[in-house]
């Protein structure tokens, strides 16, 4: 999949889909907003935020 720009609820929904039952930590301090909203990130990078 190509890199995507995901912001707000779209970013949270993507994390739900990718992480599933593992859950994830969504905190602006982790840099996920800079990485995936201000820039683009891959599904592989999103998976780094799963628990």
From Swiss-Prot:
This is Insulin. Keywords: Carbohydrate metabolism, Disulfide bond, Glucose metabolism, Hormone, Secreted. It holds the Pfam family Insulin. It comes from Ptyas dhumnades. Disulfide bonds join 7-37, 19-50, 36-41. CDD domains: IlGF_insulin_like. One of its GO terms (biological process) is glucose metabolic process. PROSITE patterns: INSULIN (PS00262). Insulin decreases blood glucose concentration. It increases cell permeability to monosaccharides, amino acids and fatty acids. It accelerates glycolysis, the pentose phosphate cycle, and glycogen synthesis in liver. One of its GO terms (molecular function) is hormone activity. One of its GO terms (cellular component) is extracellular space.
